[in-house]
Structure formats: C-alpha cells, structure tokens
Swiss-Prot record:
This is Putative HTH-type transcriptional regulatory protein PTO0557. The keyword Transcription applies. Pfam families: HTH_3. SMART domains: HTH_XRE (SM00530). Residues 143-162 bind DNA. Keywords: DNA-binding, Transcription, Transcription regulation. SUPFAM superfamilies: lambda repressor-like DNA-binding domains.
C-alpha cells in the first residue's frame, strides 16, 4: 500500500473542497514538490511525506527559490517521524521548513493556526508578548513579582513580553497567574526563506537559455527536479520555463501548463531545434534561434504574447 500517494490524493480532495485551485496529483516530472495550490492570495507549495525524517536537504534550495519567486509558502505534510506519529495541532520543522499533520494543515487553512511547535528540548508555546505585558500592568504586577511567583528570572519575563516562546509548563503557569489566554497563532505565510546556495545549472543548453534571457533584462531562478526548469521574470511578467534540448515531451508540457494555471504564470517552451509549432497545449513555443535574435525585452514579450493561448 502506497501511504504517501494515498495521502496526496486525500490532501488534493480536501484542498478542492476548501476552495483551492490545485495542481493535479500524479503530474509528470514531480519530485521537488507534490502539489501547488492557490486560494485568493494564499499560495502553498506542498511536499507530502509519510515519514518526515526522509525530508532531504537536497531539494530545499529549489523549494525556497520557487517559494520566493512565486510568493508562496512551503509546507511539508507528514504522518510520522522516527519518534512516532505527528501530533495534531503541533508545528514541526526540518531544515527551517514548517511541517504539519494532515489535520493540522486542514485546520490551518480553515483559520485555526497552531500556536505550539516542536523544537530541541520539547514543545514550545508562541506567546503574544504585547498582550502579556498589557495584562500584567493592568493587574499591577511588576516584572519582579511575576518572576518570583513563577520561579523564573526577570529576564525570562522580559523575553516573553518581547515575543519569545515558553515551554508548555511555564506557559500554563503564566496563563493561570494572569488569567488570560496568551497564545499567539503561528502563521506559516510569514516564514522568510533565506537560500544562499543556488543549484548549479549543469545542462549547457539550459544555462545558455537563462543567460540569453538575462541579457534581455530578465531575472531568473533555476528549479531542478520539477516539470519546469525555472522562472524568468521582470516586475510585470513571469514565465514558467520548459527548456527542451531535443524532442518535446507532451506529458511534461501538459504538466507545465497546468501548474502555470494555478500560479497565474505564463508557460513558455524554449526549444533547441527550430519548429513550426508556435503553441503546444496552450504554451507559446520559441526556438533558441528566435530567442538569440531578440534585440530587446519588448520584442521578446510581443513574440510570446502573440503565441500565447489563454484558453
């Protein structure tokens, strides 16, 4: 029984029911991620793992680059780790990427954000520091009084009021003493992705294509182990690129088209060999010789717009 595949299908169905536009499961060429979904301004790049301990650092640079460029959030959905099943309502991390159980994620997209996370040393509660300070002052408690009552340092109280998290046992004492819920929801959409290591582009043709697009004024990000090869973009336009060295794989082009529809990007096929086809499955096709002859970004955009099918 393929538990991971079953979980992907289960997640796909749940996202559809919750109003998301979702890329289809089982699309050709998926390795780095499993699903991409969008609902209004919410965009998630999802990796599904049965055991989260198998999450490798190898795909992180591509995930982070993709999230940064498309303004999406990365989330790993898992069932278990080496220490047991993932607990519902708890946020986990691997390599700075947030991880949740299926139920926790469904609760999250329905407005119930987790406020407890797992980290070295146990579970921690995210505290609303401003609220804690306000309630302490309303009750007339000094920092010294509260620290003495809880048996912790004054510095710890100051840290909590500055937004630091507390262990569950300390948090429960705080809540009991102040008589208020002090938890603060954790919004994974606020995660910042710092990826300093870019994947080397080993394919000479792909590297040459990006260099030519860069010469026209486009920025780019290479994405490995996905149906598309990366993104090329300026402030107004973003292309999802499929770069084909020889023959064009129909299944891969269909995958690029469907994923681009979710992210609202323009799917663009760059072909090494000249072809009379200007559009395949709704994706504009440009040969490398045509790209090489482009004298400006404006001319290139006009060529792509002419060949782009919006249906």
């Amino acid at each position: 029984m393929d538990y991971r595949h079953d979980l992907i299908i289960k997640l796909y169905d749940a996202l559809i029911k919750n109003g998301f536009n979702v890329s289809e499961p089982d699309l050709y060429g998926l390795v780095t991620f499993d699903l991409i979904c969008r609902r209004n301004d919410e965009k998630y790049i999802i990796k599904v793992l049965y055991n989260i301990d198998t999450f490798s650092r190898l795909s992180i640079s591509s995930l982070m680059a993709m999230a940064s460029v498309t303004k999406s959030s990365i989330i790993v959905i898992g069932e278990k780790s080496g220490s047991g099943r993932l607990e519902d309502g708890i946020l986990y991390y691997r390599h700075h990427i947030p991880i949740m159980s299926f139920k926790t994620f469904i609760d999250y997209i329905n407005g119930e954000s987790p406020y407890i996370y797992s980290a070295p040393g146990g579970y921690y509660v995210s505290i609303d520091g401003d609220k804690m300070r306000r309630i302490r002052e309303l009750k007339g408690y000094s920092v010294g009084y509260l620290s003495s009552k809880l048996g912790i340092s004054r510095r710890s109280i100051s840290l909590y009021e500055s937004g630091s998290s507390a262990t569950i046992d300390i948090y429960l004492k705080l809540e009991e003493t102040l008589g208020e819920d002090l938890t603060k929801d954790i919004d994974i959409r606020n995660e910042k992705y710092d990826y300093n290591i870019k994947d080397d582009i080993k394919d000479v043709f792909i590297r040459e294509t990006f260099q030519m697009l860069s010469a026209l004024g486009y920025s780019y990000e290479y994405i490995k182990k996905s149906p598309f090869d990366g993104f090329s973009y300026d402030p107004e336009t973003m292309f999802m690129l499929g770069i084909f060295n020889n023959y064009m794989e129909n299944e891969r082009i269909i995958s690029i088209k469907k994923i681009s529809q979710v992210l609202n990007n323009i799917p663009l096929i760059i072909q090494k060999e000249y072809t009379e086809k200007e559009n395949i499955y709704g994706c504009p096709v440009v040969s490398i010789s045509e790209l090489r002859s482009m004298g400006s970004m404006y001319a290139f955009k006009k060529l792509v717009e002419k060949r782009y099918s919006y249906d």
